[in-house]
Amino acid sequence: MGTALVTGATSGIGLELAWQLAEAHHDLVLVARTRERLERVATQISQFAGVGVQVIAADLSIPDDVARVADRLRVGSPAPGVPVGAAGAEGAADAPHTAAQVAARPIDLLVNDAGFAVGQPFATGDIAQERRALNVMVGAVLELTHAAVPGMVARGHGAILNVSSVTALTAMGTYAAHKAWVRTFTEGLASELRGTGVTATVLNPGLTRSEFHDRAGMDADWPDMAWLRAEDVARAALAAVRRGQVICTPSLRYLGVNALLRIAPRGVVRRVAGHASVRTRY
């Protein structure tokens, strides 16, 4: 049984990842802004999956909150552990760890999922909102990964799962820019970690049914065939982590989109992205 820390853990892909990790007998550290929702999710997961859950209410746009989560990632002495994804048979039989016990365990898997759509034109938008998005989707990913990796390397095992997007290859405003950074950063990290027993995986989902897209006003703008289910995305992501796969793009249709974006002239990509940005209220 390992321990996973998941940011953005109360909705969408992050919530589904938390559930699937719990079903594989991983203890959890759940991070999100709203304590009430965190406590509710933690209770549900602990009761139904029989694992220990610690919660950390943190706004990852605030440096002090990021520092608290980073401190949690540094917990644990260098000692051999169970590889990520290897659920021990004893996990289901043992009594769940308490939140205090979970808080003392080293983190085997860090999932950087927290993020949000800015939903405004850059030129006329609120710069404070842009800064907040940058802090959450770039700054926090950088800081939390930097906090987690040394201990994982010292223990000889661990994994980082960073959530990017197929929009990383488009030109859809600052959101796409943030996700492009996540993708490039994770690929570089994976190369750096080769041979250490620690892996880095970047998840590039397409449109996925969640509160994220509801808040961005995107739900009604795309046909049903364009949407993925969060449970399918999470399942593909965790399978990729267990294989040590660096890039995970769930579904054949988005693999095709990804390939087209890579070979299409950038001028064409910009025109298509500009049209999509208008439709999705960026």
Residue spans for each PLM region:
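Active-site helix of classical SDR
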Residues: 145, 178
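Residue(s) in the substrate-gating loop at a strand-loop-helix junction
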Residues: 165
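Conserved NAD(P)H cofactor-binding loop of Rossmann-fold oxidoreductase domains
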Residues: 113-118
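Conserved glycine-rich Rossmann-like NAD(P)H-binding loop of the short-chain dehydrogenase/reductase
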Residues: 25-40
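Conserved glycine-rich cofactor-binding loop
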Residues: 10-12
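SDR active-site lid
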Residues: 190-256, 267
